[in-house]
């Protein structure tokens, strides 16, 4: 009801949050979200996200059951009008920040990642926890996962990505659902854990594994923009022209001299990204999927 009061709002991005990763989403939970949206003149058409389990990423004996459950969740979401499902393939940690409440000059707070706060930390030895990490893991479990990914390596992670996509994308295409991959955030290794969805070359490789309109991107300008090597407006132009962007995250970041970054205001002058060129690229390529932006403290999501 509150969201409906904002002019121009038409749809909701949501998820089922009380189901353990790897299990099937209950149909009644999906239906409840769709019904609540419909009662308020909105539609539920984007899921963010159905988590990909560590067993899938690592290729353990549990992955086939987890993938089967993932596919069934896709079918159930499609039944209630979902057209796009965002997900990521980041090992162990989701997005990583060192602070969630950095005060800005205008009095707002934002998320930041400062290398000076990361340097010297060793999750294999230290008892640490950073924002964005799965709080359900014990410190011992985190250590075991880090060791497992170190042994798997980048090549092994790519192999398991391919296994997942070849099982999931055909189901999504059959259901008329776009699977929108979120880039690694930030787009470089942390604590030696492989991260592969980081740049144009690797995104091209990912999309080529299963060449389907259902194998697409959630192109987060902030995530890719954390690396100076990524020309974000050109990436937007390229993948939008290919019709391989299912979902946009429009976000600006300010890259600091040592490679640290702060999530900044959305205007181009507030950060390191040319947001004007990014929007221009979307318009000129006829982008017609879904985009959203969020406040810098991850408290509010606005569907555009």
Question: What feature does the model see in each segment?
Answer:
Residues 21-27, 57, 158, 190-204, ...:
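Gly/Pro-rich active-site loop or hairpin
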Residues 3-7, 15-70:
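Trp/Phe/Arg-rich N-terminal binding region typifying the photolyase-homology
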Residues 2-8, 28-45, 78, 170-174, ...:
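Acidic (Asp/Glu)-rich catalytic clusters
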Residues 18, 50-51, 89-93, 183-189, ...:
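Active-site-proximal loop/turn and secondary-structure-junction residues that shape catalytic pockets
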Residues 10-13, 43-45, 83-86, 176-180, ...:
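Structural preference for beta-strand elements that scaffold enzyme active sites
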Residues 56-216:
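Active-site acidic/histidine proton-transfer and metal-coordination neighborhood
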Residues 12, 77, 182, 248, ...:
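Conserved, mostly hydrophobic/aromatic
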Residues 293-300:
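Conserved small/polar residues in nucleotide/adenosyl-binding loops
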